[in-house]
Amino acid sequence: MKRPLRRPFAVLLFVVLCAAASFPSVLRRSVGPAPVLAPLPPLDPARLNATLLRLAAADPSEAPLRRDVDDLLEGRLPASSARARAWRLRGDRLHLHLRHHQFPVYRRGHHPDHDHDPLLHPLPRQELLLDPSLRRALRSWHRLRRHDPGVLRNLPSLLSLPGRIPSCAVVGNSGILLGASHGALIDSHAAVFRLNNARISGFAANVGAKTNLSFINSNVLHLCARRPNCFCHPYGDGVPILLYICQAAHFLDVASCNASSRSLHAASISVTDPRLDVLCARIVKYYSLRRFVAETGRAAEEWSSTRDAAMFHYSSGMQAIMVAVGVCDRVSVFGFGKAADAKHHYHSNQKAELDLHDYKAEYAFYRDLADRPEVVPFLNDAGIAVPPVVFYH
């Protein structure tokens, strides 16, 4: 009985082994290698450029900004303002009337003789009264917020300058300035522009000692407003400040600072023309979009998925250079750029920049501005001859 069973079992085992041996080749024939996809053809340069220009012109911050302006004009602090959120949590109920004869407004619990602290004023959403002149300024600022590259041509008159400036030095804050000994060269220019209240005391040999115009963004002024003994003019009452607005609520800081100046002859804080803001924003966004496409190979439309598009912004330094292009016959730029062995900022221990800027994109713009300004988008519609721009490293 056992012998008849052994033979069929051996035959069955042989069939199974043969099938197992042939399975990989059968699988390869049935599945086959994955087809090799041909790479996508590169996008036509003219078509890509048109896409970048179109996307750079889109402004996702316009709708929330419009709401913030409306809130202020209706006597409410914008809900998007971090300040408004803090005040709602604190529950302060101090009135603020933005009228010159009522400033400065001091923090609750502080006597005017104790601290010169004019900007720290809690503003409840329910009790905000704007001076009529501030209301007009706010309306005008928002109404002018449109694309008009011709604003560069009109900058000398907009800034109340008697004419163009023969030579300008724009001084950034990079640590590469330390040890560069550019101080005397910087001060030899007819005008020196500085950024975000950077210290010059103790650094004059490398960064110069002269300041004719200070550029800041409104976040810097607002942060100053949170500290005791905040003075609006760190370079002295006679040095004008040009400030671009990051949030509509920061108009309150500007109005407060201007109204509480320690001297009747103090230079005022001027808000940049919003048409210049729009021009700067479009140029930097274009270069950021172009960098994104070149480095990732992805569609330009996907750029916004990697950044907070509504908060994306150019730097104070970029706008300072743009103003210099508009008002100066010759522009020298110092303290822009990074080095592995250099501090981030020459005057502080800050380690990195904010994500809302794209500095690599701005550096690409600077290279084009210095070497081939005719290719810079939007700038070529400004109707001006771009002056010589030299970057010192």
Curated annotation (Swiss-Prot):
Residues 1-8 are cytoplasmic. GO terms for cellular component: Golgi membrane. It holds the Pfam family Glyco_transf_29. It is an enzyme of class 2 (transferase). Keywords: Glycoprotein, Glycosyltransferase, Golgi apparatus, Membrane, Signal-anchor, Transferase, Transmembrane, Transmembrane helix. Its EC number is 2.4.99.-. GO terms for biological process: protein glycosylation. It is found in: Golgi apparatus membrane. Residues 28-393 are lumenal. The chain crosses the membrane at residues 9-27. It comes from the Eukaryota. The keyword ATP-binding does not apply. Glycans are attached at residues 49, 212, 258. It is a single-pass type II membrane protein. PANTHER family: BETA-1,6-GALACTOSYLTRANSFERASE GALT29A (PTHR46779:SF1). Belongs to the glycosyltransferase 29 family. This is Sialyltransferase-like protein 1. It comes from Oryza sativa subsp. indica (Rice). The gene is STLP1.
